A protein has these predicted regions:
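Conserved phosphate/anionic-ligand binding catalytic regions in large, soluble enzymes, centered on
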Residues: 1, 7, 48-53, 212-214, ...
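Short gly/ser/thr-rich secondary-structure transition/capping motifs
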Residues: 18-24, 67-73, 114, 181-185, ...
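Glycine-rich phosphate/diphosphate-binding loops that line cofactor/substrate pockets in enzymes
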Residues: 22-36, 81, 188-197, 243
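Acidic catalytic cores of enzymes that act on phosphate-bearing nucleotides/polynucleotides
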Residues: 62, 195-258
Length: 260
């Protein structure tokens, strides 16, 4: 898992060196279509990456975005109106029927369908109109690391091309170097705080809340800890009562309006 996590910079660099014209073409398609809304289709870590993408689309493009509830298509056969909708699926494997079948449904109903997927030979890749590879390489660890990070980047690329935002594109281009530096950072100071913990609260707000959700999942998956993520906007409404002396908090304080 650690090896795959620290390789994220290389994976992101590989992704950014590929498919530039395809992303530009997708951006032109998105700008030429008047979508009234967008929907994300994903599960687990990929759903957290989808929440990050949803923040970007709503904040920058002004379109309402919802995460498709699990089993709505596969079990309940709900008659959703899909025309003039953008449907984006995110998946490492591209195998889950709960992701593949909704994308087929949306495409058949006239929606624009995009798959951000690591396995480009998967059923999901074959089902979507637009398939954008993550270029994360094979992931051995059950806990997703490099595929999660490359999913975030792919989502940001989609929005950067849709908005045709040069500043965002420049920020994305700088990511491999920034990630490489982060991988070299000394995180040992956190060990004394986290090692004895049995419960952890993870806090984020706005664009960082999906990352807080993923961090909490990682604590559960890898360390069998009771970790829960909360928005910084809601932490005073109940969660604060759980905090006592010595209770560990992990806070993602990203620059911008949410940091205050």
């Amino acid at each position: 898992m650690l090896k795959e996590a620290v390789s994220a910079a290389e994976c992101v660099a590989l992704q950014l060196s590929n498919d530039a014209e395809r992303y530009a073409e997708l951006g032109r398609k998105l700008r030429s279509t008047n979508y009234h809304s967008a929907v994300t289709v994903a599960r687990g870590s990929s759903d957290h990456a989808s929440a990050y993408l949803a923040y970007l689309i709503m904040a920058r493009m002004g379109r309402l975005v919802t995460s498709l509830p699990m089993s709505l298509i596969t079990l309940y056969k709900s008659p959703l109106v899909t025309r003039d909708t953008l449907a984006v699926a995110i998946s490492q494997s591209g195998q889950s029927p709960d992701v593949v079948e909704p994308i087929r449904y949306f495409r058949d109903g006239g929606a624009t369908t995009v798959a951000l997927v690591n396995d480009t030979t998967s059923p999901l890749a074959e089902s979507a109109e637009w398939t954008m590879p993550l270029h994360a390489g094979k992931e051995q660890s059950v806990a997703a690391t490099k595929s999660f990070i490359t999913s975030l980047v792919a989502g940001a690329r989609l929005v950067a091309e849709w908005q045709s935002d040069a500043e965002l594109k420049d920020g994305i281009a700088a990511l491999p170097e920034v990630l490489a530096e982060a991988a070299k950072a000394d995180w040992s100071a956190a060990l004394d705080v986290l090692a004895p913990a049995r419960n952890i609260m993870v806090v984020g707000r706005g664009i960082s809340f999906p990352v807080a959700l993923e961090s909490a999942l990682k604590f559960k998956e890898t360390s069998a800890l009771q970790a829960e993520a909360f928005s910084g906007a809601e932490i005073k409404h109940g969660p604060m009562a759980l905090i006592e002396e010595g209770y560990p908090l992990v806070i993602f304080a990203t620059r911008g309006p949410a940091q205050a």
